[in-house]
Amino acid sequence: LEVISSLNPIPGTIVKEVTKMEKMLVRGVTKDNDVARISIVGLTDVPGIAFKIFSKLAAKNINVDIILQSVGRNNTKDIAFTVSKDNAPIAIDAIRELAFVGDDTPITCDTDVAKVSVVGAGMETHPGTASKMFEALFNSDINIQMISTSEIKISVLIDAKDADRAVAAVHEAFL
């Protein structure tokens, strides 16, 4: 089928059968070893804490990727997020500058992590994509520390030592 304009003699758009590549939901698997996870434990569970933390990091020009906030309990919550390894010390110093973060507030930084992602179009409208990725990691005995999703990407944070095995397992599952 060709869709053309009756007013313009140029060739139109050919509509044809979907190819195997067009049927593939996941188009690639990526790995990022330049990642650090920062965790802040026991923050008071009140409005504005996340805003204050992440606006402070933005003011220092620190890009934040994956963010995880725990469900509040006993009027406290934990926040963990990832930044580049180079920005981790700057991020920790910036957080320590905040008035509500005391010297005794536990802040940890783990640089022995990696981010593995599957990339493709329309993932949020295809049930089971995340499950398939998580199954591939489970079958390879790889623990997931954090998860982030978007319409085109599902990312997990894992131990850096498992990154190459994770890429291979996820690649095998999808591609």
Regions found by a protein language model. Give the residues of each.
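C-terminal catalytic "cap/lid" subdomain
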Residues: 1-149, 153-175
